[in-house]
Amino acid sequence: MKKKILISVGMAALFLCASWQEAETTVSPDRLFLADNGKSLFVTNRAGCELIKMSPDGQKMEKKVSFSSPVNAMTQDANGKLRVVCDGNYGTMYELDGKKLSVQSKIKSGATPSDILYNPLSKSLWVTQRFNNELWEIDPATRKVKTKIAVGREPVSMAAFAGDSCLLIANNLPEMPSTAYHPE
């Protein structure tokens, strides 16, 4: 029987910082993302505006892709496509091939996208717009905004719960959590 060890995100980031070496490059791990049902680890390099896929043991970079500005968030759909949002240059959403880590398309996604989530029930992408104080529902096939919902002040993060039927939106300024319900 294999034992599973849970490492807090803070400890994992410290582990990566201590073991990560790349000649003559500034690397500043900022965010961690899991994909492929927890089998793939991605790390953002804020200084280099990169998304890096790490080896399963976390010791080596397998692949990396560069963007026009730092990556704020990442999600993966049921088909394995990755999508990331970057807030520079008036906000961009990139669609990536999950295996090759190559950019398939990019679109403007609001001025300040701070988080992105794929919802399997609505088959939509949900993007928080930090300084617009909104949650956007985007159709992945057409890449068009379907719905805009006001959600308090500076939404920075979200999490699905109740079997993906609800979203909890975390706001940055004063304690104002909001809940947005997904249409089924």
What residues fall within each predicted segment?
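Predominantly soluble domains enriched in secretory-pathway, periplasmic, or organellar proteins
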Residues: 14-184
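Sec-dependent N-terminal signal peptides
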Residues: 5-14
